[in-house]
Amino acid sequence: MSYVLNLDRIALYIHYERELSEDEKTSIKQYLKKMVEENKTFDELKGEKKDFKEENLDIFNKSVEYLKKNGVPNPLLDTEYIFSDVLKVNKNTLKYSMSREIKEEDKNKIREMLVLRAKKRKPLQYILGEWEFYGLPFKMSEGVLIPRADTEILVEQCIQLMREVEEPNILDIGSGSGAISIAVANELKSSSVTGIDINEKAIKLAIENKILNKIENVNFIESNLFGKLDKDFKYDLIVSNPPYISKDEYETLMPEVKNYEPQNALTDLGDGLHFYKEISKLAGEYLKDTGYLAFEIGYNQAKDVSKILQDNNFAILSIVKDYGGNDRVIIAKKAIKAENFEEIEEEEDVNLSE
């Protein structure tokens, strides 16, 4: 089994639950038949075949050097992803799969992917066509923003906020590939999540990812901010990872980002604060009185975004740092207006007198 599946025997148990392909089933049957007909052990049969480990490791190491020479960040990691994708093995078990011959067609695929990564500086996620976010697989395609690891912090905060809320209604503004919406919906099974995006291509991809992950409690709508939403419907949480890179910073981005990812998902071509202002201005109308607003922010934007939120009747609850120690998420709560305090006090007085 391990030989046919291109895995070390130690790693075989990891793949027990996956279904065998017809080619794999046929190959196993052929080996079993040959063992019986020739009265040989499998090790004897395998001994007749060449071990390609040294040759394959040489190809792998040359691939790493090729990416490194062309200035690609994380060349070892990218090479591991490329080899794993082409050889159809888990990245964590790749080293156990190097003894089998790599077919010429697979070598060609690896070369093509390496060239795209090194010479064209195409993002690895677009080359692979899939990427993992919050432990879930997501299809990736050009024209839709690639989800970053730091955005998982925003997801974690949303889950914590809504964990004790009964059947929470959540709105994700600028949902892109659906990463935030789907990850939150997957963790909060009783929730109802709506993702909105102005990009038609992003909406289509998000729906594909919803189907891929078999998530039922999430829907996606093509809408420019709140444009197509029902004003009478109120949410427990509004979350957004808006385009927050300033125009000046955008010009300094790596070619992988600047030349491939959608500009309007990265920058407002201004100071990076435009969408915080637009969302904060209207969010209160779509939130319940106990509702929350959660933003991903740039490393230097906590002070400015805090002021924007406070100017729009939100109270800052927390600012959360990312894995690098930078401010990355800001959580705010809809503040109760002064007239509402008076109403509450009057009601409390009545109740107390009773």
Swiss-Prot record:
GO biological process, one term: translational termination
GO molecular function: nucleic acid binding; protein-(glutamine-N5) methyltransferase activity; protein-glutamine N-methyltransferase activity
Function of the protein: Methylates the class 1 translation termination release factors RF1/PrfA and RF2/PrfB on the glutamine residue of the universally conserved GGQ motif.
Gene that produces this protein: prmC
PANTHER family, per the entry: HEMK METHYLTRANSFERASE, MTRF1L RELEASE FACTOR GLUTAMINE METHYLTRANSFERASE
Family: Belongs to the protein N5-glutamine methyltransferase family. PrmC subfamily.
Protein name: Release factor glutamine methyltransferase
Residues binding S-adenosyl-L-methionine, per UniProt: G174, S175, G176, S177, G178, D197, N241
Residues holding substrate: N241, P242, P243, Y244
Statement: the UniProt record of this protein carries the keyword Electron transport: no
EC numbers for this chain: 2.1.1.297
Keyword S-adenosyl-L-methionine recorded: yes
Coiled coil regions, renumbered to chain: none
Keyword list, A-Z: Methyltransferase, S-adenosyl-L-methionine, Transferase
A Pfam family the protein falls into: MTS
